[in-house]
Amino acid sequence: MGLRARDIVLSTVAAESLLRLEQSPDPASRSIARRVRSLRSILLADCLHGEVVKKDRIPKALKDKHGLENLFVEDLPSFWRLLYTIVRDRGERYIVVVEIADHRVYDRWSPGRSR
C-alpha cells in the first residue's frame, strides 16, 4: 500500500494543457489525455508513484514559477510528461499537477540532460 493523497488539483497551466489535448482531433493527443485521467486513481492510492526529481535537479524555471519543494515525473505516451508536487494542508496530502508538457518543453527545463 502506498502513501495516499486526499485529492489531485490541476494548476491553471496543466488544466489548459489537458483541455487542449482532449479537444485535439489528433488520436495521439487524446491518448495522452486518457493516460492523464487514468493516473488519477493510481496517484491517489500512491502519491509517490512517479519518478522523484532530486531537489538540486528541479529546474529553476519550474521552482520559480510554481514554488516547488519537491517534484515527481510521470511518463505519458508520445514522450509527454506529467509533473506534479505533493503539498500538505491541515495534515492532509494533496497532489498538484503543475505541468503537462511534451518532450521539447521538458528538455528545455533540463538542458544537458537529454536522452
What are these regions (language model features)?
Residues 1-80, 87-115:
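Basic, Lys/Arg-enriched alpha-helical interface segments
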